[in-house]
C-alpha cells in the first residue's frame, strides 16, 4: 500500500471529521486501511491501549495516509460516559480524539468526585433533561477538567444542555451493541474484521498484515 501525502502544511493526524456512525475519523478519509476502536472513556483497558498506542499509531500509520483511525465512544458506563462523550464532542472533530487521550491519561483520578458525590449526582440526574447533564458535570468536576483543555465552561454548559444531541449519542452508542454486535471495550476492527486481541502489539500486527508497512 502506497503512502499518500497530507494536504500541504498539515499532518494527516491533525485532520478529522465526524462519520455517519457518530465516530471521529482521524487521518486520510480515503485511506485503504480503516481502523475502528469502540472504546469507553472510563474503560481502564482503553486507557492502557491509548498509552501504548497513540503515538506510534499516529506517527507510523495515520500520518502515512495509508491508515485512518475512527474512534467510536461506546458509553457503556452510563451518565459519566455520556457526559464525557458530549464534552469531547463539544469542540471541533479534530479536538475529540486528543481530548479522549487526555481523559484516559488521567483516568485513575477522574472518577474520584463521582464516587464521593453519588447523592448529589443522583439529584442532578433527576433534574429536567436540559439541566441534568450540566449539573452532573459540574458536580463531577468535569467542567474544570475540560476548561483546562480548551473547552470553556460556557461552551461545555451549552453542549451539555443539548438534550437532543445527548439522546443521539446514547442511541448511536446503543446501536454499537445491537447493530454492530460489540460486546466490550476496547474492541478493534480493521477493514471490517474484528480483532481478537486488545493490545497494541496485536493491533499493529493486524495493520501490517493489511499492508500498512
Summary of predicted features, one role per range:
Residues 1, 40, 130-213:
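C-terminal cap of thioredoxin/glutaredoxin-like
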Residues 1-81, 173-174, 212-213:
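Extracytoplasmic thiol/disulfide redox context detector
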Residues 3-18, 101-103, 130-140:
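Periplasmic c-type cytochrome electron-transfer domains
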Residues 11-13, 110, 200:
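Tryptophan-centered motif/residue detector
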Residues 16, 90, 159:
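Functionally engaged cysteine thiol sites
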Residues 32, 46-50, 73-81, 92-96, ...:
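Solvent-exposed, acidic/flexible segments
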Residues 36-38, 120-124, 152-154:
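A short alpha-helix capping/helix-coil boundary motif
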Residues 41, 47-133:
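Structural alpha/beta surface segment adjacent to cysteine/selenocysteine redox centers
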Amino acid at each position: 500500500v502506497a503512502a499518500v501525502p497530507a494536504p500541504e502544511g498539515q499532518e494527516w493526524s491533525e485532520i478529522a471529521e465526524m462519520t455517519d456512525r457518530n465516530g471521529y475519523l482521524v487521518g486520510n478519509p480515503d485511506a485503504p486501511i480503516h481502523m475502528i476502536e469502540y472504546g469507553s472513556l472510563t474503560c481502564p483497558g482503553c486507557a492502557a491501549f491509548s498509552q501504548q498506542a497513540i503515538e506510534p499509531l499516529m506517527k507510523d500509520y495515520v500520518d502515512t495516509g495509508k491508515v485512518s483511525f475512527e474512534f467510536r465512544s461506546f458509553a457503556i458506563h452510563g451518565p459519566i460516559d455520556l457526559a464525557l462523550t458530549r464534552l469531547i464532542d463539544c469542540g471541533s472533530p479534530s479536538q475529540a480524539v486528543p481530548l479522549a487521550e487526555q481523559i484516559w491519561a488521567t483516568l485513575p483520578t477522574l472518577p474520584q468526585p463521582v464516587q464521593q458525590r453519588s447523592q448529589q449526582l443522583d439529584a442532578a440526574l433527576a433534574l429536567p433533561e436540559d439541566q441534568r447533564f450540566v449539573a452532573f458535570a459540574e458536580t463531577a468536576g468535569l467542567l474544570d477538567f475540560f476548561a483546562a483543555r480548551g473547552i470553556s465552561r460556557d461552551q461545555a454548559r451549552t453542549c451539555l444542555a443539548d438534550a437532543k444531541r445527548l439522546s443521539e449519542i446514547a442511541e448511536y452508542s446503543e446501536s454499537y451493541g445491537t447493530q454492530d454486535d460489540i460486546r466490550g471495550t476496547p474492541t478493534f476492527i480493521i477493514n471490517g474484521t474484528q480483532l481478537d486481541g486488545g493490545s497494541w502489539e496485536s493491533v499493529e500486527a493486524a495493520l501490517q498484515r493489511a499492508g500498512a508497512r
